[in-house]
Amino acid sequence: EMTSSLVGSEMCIRDRDRQLHIEDYLQMVSAEQKEYAEVSAHQRITENNDIITDFQTDNLMEQILHKDNLNKAYKKVKSNKGAGGVDGMSVDELLGFLKDNQEQLIQQIKDGKYKPNPVRRVEIPKETKGEVRKLGVPTVVDRVFQQAITQVLTPIYEKQFSEDSFGFRPNRGAHDALKQCQTNVNDGYVYVVDMDLEKFFDTVCQSKLIEVLSRTIKDGRVISLIHKYLNAGVISRGMFEKTEVGMPQGGPLSPLLSNIMLNELDKELTRRGHRFVRYADDCMIFCKSRKSAERTLNNIVPYIEGKLFLKVNRTKTCVAHISKVKYLGYSFYRYKGICRFRVHPKSVTKMKNKIRELTDRHNGWGNEYRALKLTQFIRGWVNYFGMADMKGLLQSNDKWLRHRIRAIYWKQWKKPKTKYRKLKELGMNEDFIQWHANMRQGIWNCSNNRLVQFALSNEKLREWGYPTFTEFYLKICEN
């Protein structure tokens, strides 16, 4: 537990340099980007009421640096774990460092002398071949302060955010966004402007963001600290790069800042009377006809580029019928006039690639560990895509998955005498075992043989802990 207050760090405070290291940052990002979605219940204000009267926004720094808020922020960062930043400090080392340096660091923030560390660049491949998503990993100390800022600002801005915005917000998620899409389609809005903002996080105009923040936040110290985080720079391949444009994607603060910036677009769409759904920077505007959608696109682009200084990707932005678009991994179709969901083919491909990775016969995993990893992935995947009509898809997918699992065992048994012994242990008739144990048709073909299927039956694989997509899906349907 922390004592009175907390910390933010400068490299000069540490007694030794730490070597940069590369780690997988995806889990931390996934957890921490959703972190600020734990705040008070959201309320609504009128469109023109930009002044918050029930929050004191001129003394926010004291609220941010209050010991209870900082302790809460520390616990969040601690629970999320995640890789270290440029100073190499791990989450496990954080508490000791904070105890030794908290007073000095807090005083630096109060005096306006605190200088955040640069973020560490991590590149994650996108679905589009050759493209990467650039993440910025803050130091664990900077993550604490970003989390502390987020916890104070979130309830203030929740009162301003649109009901049609769903990304990284309290008690809202992708399923809520999809249900709103469904409602719009059922009301006859079957054409959409599928809006793609080109490299949103990398191209945000910092001065515009600061302008928007300053309308609500009257404590200049908080504005200054946020600006310092935006300008902290990045360490990429050991080299420092300035960050005068854009904001790092990966810390606890970035999801909130992105929603604050794009709330300007939400307000403009609402003012013009459009139906829309936005999840983070994924936005769809709904219209009743193609001509109306084309007109909407032509009219909104000048606002996005001329007023918000963001760039619309004209290659990926399009006007289309709802049945032709992909949104949050789903596709849409209408049955008897009602909008329904499918898993988009690209999402199926991505899922199968992950299954191939988890059932790779050469990864050296133990069978129990593999069954555990498969269970974790399949449960999460089905929970997310459970709104889709996919029973037939999952049944065929389960058949393919079981084939891959049987191939793993057939490879592990290697020698004919081992195969003979294993098949006998599984209760197979000795009259057939000898021939099957000496088959030379290749692992994939042999593992699909009817005797092997009978020996490694669906029930046996389930007994050994291997999951199926269908069983998880049926549980969702029952609930």
Describe each region flagged by the PLM.
Residues 134, 242-245, 356-370, 380-393, ...:
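Short, solvent-exposed helix-loop connector elements
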Residues 108-123, 131, 160-324:
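Conserved polymerase palm-domain catalytic core
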Residues 388-411:
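Short secondary-structure subsegments characteristic of cysteine-rich extracellular domains
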Residues 231, 307-372, 376-379:
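A conserved non-catalytic segment of reverse transcriptases
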Residues 31-33, 37-93, 151-167:
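Charged boundary/loop elements
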Residues 1-13:
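Single conserved hydrophobic/aromatic residue that forms the stacking wall/gate
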Residues 65, 118-120, 126-128, 368-385:
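Core structural elements
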Residues 413-479:
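Extended C-terminal regions of large enzymes
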